[in-house]
Amino acid sequence: MNTVKTVRELRAAVARARSEGKRIGFVPTMGNLHSGHIALITKATQRVDFVVASIFVNPLQFGAGEDLDKYPRTLAADQEKLLEAGCDLLFAPTVEEMYPDGMAGQTRVSVPQLSEGLCGASRPGHFEGVATVVSKLFNMVQPDLAIFGQKDFQQLAVIRALVHDLNMPIQIIGEPTVRAADGLALSSRNGFLSEEERAVAPVVYRTLSSIAESIKQGERDFPALIQAQRQQLEAAGLRPDYLEIRHALTLRPATAEDRDLVILVAAFLGTTRLIDNLHLNLDTPA
């Protein structure tokens, strides 16, 4: 596996692979890799001939007071994991390489509607930052396909819309969330949890599962269901940012008639913000 730090080196390496007739797969990350990230790399190796990963902690998607400065940087360990997983090329640029003219005047990419509400409400500008950096990375790599985790469900919806609306010839694949044995979704931010908080954290997924089970059993009073489960989160010591049932494709608030649903949650446990979701299609046999 080669590691490159400049756009010029990246494009040269990808061009060589293309000249050999290889299909290109891309997995963008912010580093501090865990088993969830590695599952994306593994999936890519099964689908394409040449796998590119990126590690870039993107300042444009962090708001004031968020954890940009303390976000873990673990490049050497990440390189070892990527190599073992079969990654062919790692792009690990600096902020200056990604934004050579600074960020203040940087052209921004915005995906309206899908970026609003949920994480977009509590993290203003976040999805604009995501859409902008992903657009830049897609233009740099020009992959045949790109793979993202479904844990960031709203982000995945934004990226699908971005690719569709801007006519990018890239197949977007969403991979199921990888979980610990107790159900907690794997996340780079889980490392911020204390031992006591980590013991409490699985209640997030249990809450989603409980809501899904109630819906499967015929419950359609979504506001009452959400209110009861929100209280359960609070009783466990979490501070819910949101807990909502949405239509899985449009992300609009779900109605009792909808069949393709996603239950989404964001909640603070101590100072750590945890997000998770559970996709529930009532027309798909269990």
Swiss-Prot record:
Cellular component, GO annotation: cytosol
GO BP term, pick one: pantothenate biosynthetic process
Disulfide bonds: none
The protein's annotated pathway: Cofactor biosynthesis; (R)-pantothenate biosynthesis; (R)-pantothenate from (R)-pantoate and beta-alanine: step 1/1
Binding site for beta-alanine: Q61
Record GO terms (molecular function): ATP binding; pantoate-beta-alanine ligase activity
Residues that coordinate or bind (R)-pantoate: Q61, Q155
Binding site for ATP: 30-37, 149-152, 178, 186-189
Main location: cytoplasm
Subunit record text: Homodimer.
More details: The reaction proceeds by a bi uni uni bi ping pong mechanism.
Protein name per UniProt: Pantothenate synthetase
Chain's gene name: panC
